Design a protein with these regions (language model features):
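Pre-catalytic or accessory/regulatory segments outside the catalytic core
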Residues: 1-155
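A domain-level signal for caspase-like cysteine endopeptidase catalytic cores
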Residues: 20-25, 31, 37, 54-55, ...
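Short alpha-helical segments and helix-capping/turn motifs at coil-helix boundaries
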Residues: 58-64, 120-130, 134, 181-184, ...
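Extracellular/periplasmic catalytic domains that process cell-envelope and extracellular macromolecules
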Residues: 69-71, 133-137, 191-192, 264-267, ...
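Well-ordered, non-membrane alpha-helical segments in soluble/globular domains
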Residues: 87-96, 122-125, 214-221, 305-316, ...
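Structural motif
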Residues: 140, 270-271, 327
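Cysteine protease catalytic core and zymogen-processing segment of caspase-like enzymes
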Residues: 162-174, 280-347
Length: 347
């Protein structure tokens, strides 16, 4: 078990050098990095308001509203003000499908203005940052565009009380393909996925980061007990929901295993959870756009080495991948994208 004296081993491997993207950080330095900066005055006012009004803030939907039912909790798509008409039209099949299922008062097409913080976006639409009013800004939000259009900090702030997703593709055709895929899946007469959760967690020799993620995260989730205790499968979340588990942990967490799961070559999982290093590349490296955030597999031979055979990148996912209905969690450095500029590791 880690102790309070241990340095923090941050997730991420440099795709050029094969070394840690950021060296281990001592706790004092980490505390300094985590201290509020820039918008600290707003954060302080927000903290004080929460302290003074604890009973007024639930960060939740109104009493009696079922969050698992979009018809009650509401759904909205959020476009940047400058989103092209082509992208908007590409998503129209999905928007029309949602409109047909959700009452008009709980369905919205919203606009995000450039540079707008989350609380101003919500205020402009008549909603607070805390509690959810589905008829104003619903519980389910779909942001359209990359972090250069709608910043990550806006997404994270909205996520305090809402279920927020994001679509970011390069072309209108890709948005259209996504929309058509979702509508086809939801209108299908049968569910193609199996009631199975896939668990993928490499552990590299001499790497404290993946030792912790494999032993303290993936194994307890997959087996219902820490790595140093006997498995208790009946205690797992998957078992309680009557899902089977298929695990690839430590030596089994290969690139081939993950690609097989993603392409649905055997059993098509309904849920996939991975915990690994993600790759990071310098700004002037041609591989940054294609391979940033790629998942480092057990095939990696160790510090100082790096080849495409060691990781799973977007380019490894072929057009015949059977991803329909898959809910995937990629716990990795840059696993959800890369902001510009990167401020995560700066003090």
């Amino acid at each position: 078990m880690p102790s309070s004296e241990d340095p923090l081993f941050l997730n991420g491997i440099d795709g050029v050098t094969g070394q840690y993207l950021v060296p281990p950080v001592g706790l004092p330095a980490a505390a300094k990095m985590a201290a509020p900066r820039g918008n600290a005055s707003y954060l302080e006012r927000w903290k004080n308001w929460l302290f003074d009004n604890p009973l007024l803030t639930k960060f939740d939907t109104p009493f009696g509203v079922n969050k698992n039912d979009p018809a009650q909790a509401g759904w909205a798509v959020v476009f940047h003000a400058q989103t092209s008409e082509e992208v908007r039209k590409s998503l129209e099949p999905l928007i029309a499908h949602r409109r047909s299922l959700i009452p008009s008062e709980q369905f919205h097409v919203l606009t995000y203005q450039p540079g707008e913080p989350a609380h101003k976006f919500l205020s402009r639409h008549g909603a607070p940052l805390s509690d959810v009013e589905p008829t104003r800004v619903p519980y389910y939000l779909l942001l359209v565009g990359g972090p250069d259009e709608i910043p990550f900090d806006v997404e994270h702030s909205l996520s305090l009380s809402r279920a927020v997703g994001r679509l970011s593709f390069d072309t209108p055709a890709e948005y259209a393909r996504y929309a058509e895929s979702v509508v086809a899946y939801e209108k299908g007469s049968s569910v193609p996925n199996h009631r199975q959760v896939g668990w993928w967690g490499p552990k590299h020799l001499g790497d404290r980061s993946t030792e912790l993620s494999a032993h303290q995260l993936v194994i307890p989730l997959a087996r219902g007990a820490p790595a140093d205790q006997p498995p208790q499968p009946t205690r797992t979340i998957a078992s309680k929901l009557r899902y089977a588990s298929n695990e690839a942990i430590e030596d089994d967490a290969t690139k081939e295993w993950l690609l097989t799961a993603l392409h649905g070559r055997e059993v098509r999982p309904a849920v996939l959870f991975t915990a690994s290093h993600g790759l990071g590349f310098p700004a002037n490296d041609a591989r940054q756009r294609s391979d940033q955030g790629a998942l480092l597999s057990q095939d990696w031979t160790g510090f100082g080495a790096m080849t495409p055979a060691h990781y799973v990148a977007a380019s490894d996912i072929q057009d015949d991948a059977r991803l329909h209905g898959l809910v995937a969690f990629f716990f990795a450095c840059f696993g959800g994208g890369t902001p510009t500029p990167v401020s995560l590791y700066t003090s």
